[in-house]
Amino acid sequence: MQSKHRKLLLRCLLVLPLILLVDYCGLLTHLHELNFERHFHYPLNDDTGSGSASSGLDKFAYLRVPSFTAEVPVDQPARLTMLIKSAVGNSRRREAIRRTWGYEGRFSDVHLRRVFLLGTAEDSEKDVAWESREHGDILQAEFTDAYFNNTLKTMLGMRWASDQFNRSEFYLFVDDDYYVSAKNVLKFLGRGRQSHQPELLFAGHVFQTSPLRHKFSKWYVSLEEYPFDRWPPYVTAGAFILSQKALRQLYAASVHLPLFRFDDVYLGIVALKAGISLQHCDDFRFHRPAYKGPDSYSSVIASHEFGDPEEMTRVWNECRSANYA
C-alpha cells in the first residue's frame, strides 16, 4: 500500500511541474482565446456600441506647453510637426535631436516644428523647467513618466495637436532613441504643397501579430486584458506619420475608447474603429540596419536603436553631408 502511495506521489511530482510549465508558457491560455475575425470588439465591456466608455484623457492637465522659438516664423503653418516621445531624464538625447534631425531651421523652404512629449519625474522637474524656458519645445502633462504610460503620452500629444496645433499638414510621432532623416520624410510625403499621399495617411512599419501569452514576458497579456487571438494591424509606435485629417479623426475616435497598455496596439484599435487604413513603409526601420557609411542609410526615414546621442549625431552628420538627411 505504501508503495502505491509513493508511486502516485512521484507521478504527481513529475506531472505538476509539466502542468505549471505549460501554463507559464501560455499554451493553455491559447486554447481559450477568441477568434479575432468573429468576436473582436472594443471596449471589452461594451458590446452595445453605446459609446459610454471613455479614454479618460480629460483628467490630465498640461504643466508646460511649447512657446516656440524664432527659428521659423510662428504664423506660418508647418509642413511637418515632430512630436518626440522622451523620458524626463533623457535631456542629452533631446539636445542632440535639437542639433540634428529636429532642427526647425533645417530647410529654408519647408517649415518644421519640434515638440518633446514628457510626463513627470520628481527629481528632474527643475531641469525640465529650465529646458522649457530655454527652448520652448516642451509639452509636459501631469502623469508619471514610465514605459507603460506611453499610450497616455502619445494620446496627450495627439490631443494637444488636435486641439491647439492643428494647422500642420503632417505629424511625425517618434521616440527619442531614433535616427530620423527629415529629408527622406519630406520625400515620402511629396516635397510640394500637393502631397501624393492619401488625405487619411497613417504610415509606418505595419505589424500583424498576436498577443504574447508567455507569463515570463515583459509584454505578457492576460485573457482578461485582451481575449482575442491576434491584434488588429498596427503601426509600431516608435515612428509613424499622420496627416492632419487622420490625426483629427484618430483623436476623435479615441475619446470613447479606454486606453490600452501598448500604444501601438491601441492606435491600431483606434484606426480600425475610425476606418483608417494603415500604410506600410519598409524605410521606417523597427530593427536598426547595419550602418556602413551614408550610402547604407540613403533611403532610411527613421531607425530604432539609436539610444547613444553621440552616435546618432555622428551618423546623422555623415548622412547630411552625403545629402541623405
From Swiss-Prot:
Superkingdom per UniProt: Eukaryota
Topology of this chain in the membrane: Single-pass type II membrane protein
Claim: Protein transport is one of the keywords in the record: no
This protein's UniProt keywords: Developmental protein, Glycoprotein, Glycosyltransferase, Golgi apparatus, Membrane, Notch signaling pathway, Signal-anchor, Transferase, Transmembrane, Transmembrane helix
Entry annotated with the keyword Transmembrane helix: yes
Stretches in topological domain Lumenal: 29-325
Gene Ontology MF, one: UDP-glycosyltransferase activity
Compartment(s) where it occurs, according to its Swiss-Prot or TrEMBL record: Golgi apparatus membrane
UniProt-listed InterPro entries: Glyco_trans_31, Nucleotide-diphossugar_trans
Segments on the Cytoplasmic face: 1-7
EC number: 2.4.1.62
Sugar attachment sites: N149, N166
Family, per entry: Belongs to the glycosyltransferase 31 family.
Record function comment: Neurogenic protein essential for the development and maintenance of epithelial structure. Required in the germline for establishing the follicular epithelium and for determining the dorsal-ventral polarity. Collaborates with Notch on the apical surface of follicle cells to mediate germline-follicle cell adhesion. Brn has a role in chorion formation.
Protein name in UniProt: Beta-1,3-galactosyltransferase brn
Gene that this sequence comes from: brn
